[in-house]
A protein has these predicted regions:
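Intrinsically disordered, low-complexity linkers and terminal tails enriched in Pro/Gly
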Residues: 1, 28-33, 110-115
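Structured beta-strand/loop patches that form or line metal/cofactor-binding pockets in enzymes
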Residues: 1-9
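Active-site- and interface-proximal helix/loop "cap" or "latch" segments in soluble metabolic
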Residues: 19-86, 90
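C-terminal charged interaction modules
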Residues: 79-115
Length: 115
């Protein structure tokens, strides 16, 4: 059986706030670690029936980038849900929520003249 690995390295400041996130994967084809400004990692514990999560972002992550990150993450979560359940109606609801979330964020930014 083939084994793959994903490695995540987080550089913290003196207050334990992430300054840099780098990741690499054995099957990525890249020799150098990839930089990221944010990450969300979730595991399902079947015994406890609960999600275990690690959410990190660097000091450099801007608010508009965070909104983009959440929008894209919500959309891809909806795609994953559809692939695993074939439930088109729930997938559409999730995608509608993601779009509404993003549109509301953009409207707030326009109102505050931040974009």
């Amino acid at each position: 059986m083939k084994q793959s690995s994903i490695n995540i390295n987080v550089q913290l400041d003196e207050d334990k706030v992430p300054e840099e996130i780098r990741w690499s994967a054995s099957d990525s084809g890249s020799n150098a670690p990839n930089k990221a400004k944010a990450m969300m990692l979730a595991f399902w514990d079947g015994a406890d029936k609960s999600a275990l999560r690690i959410d990190l972002w660097t000091k450099q992550m801007m608010m508009d980038e965070m909104a983009d990150f959440f929008y894209q993450t919500l959309m891809t979560m909806a795609d994953t849900y559809k692939r695993s359940t074939q439930n088109e109606e729930m997938t559409n609801d999730m995608k509608k929520f993601a779009k509404d979330f993003y549109n509301k964020f953009r409207a707030q930014q326009l109102k505050e003249n931040k974009i």
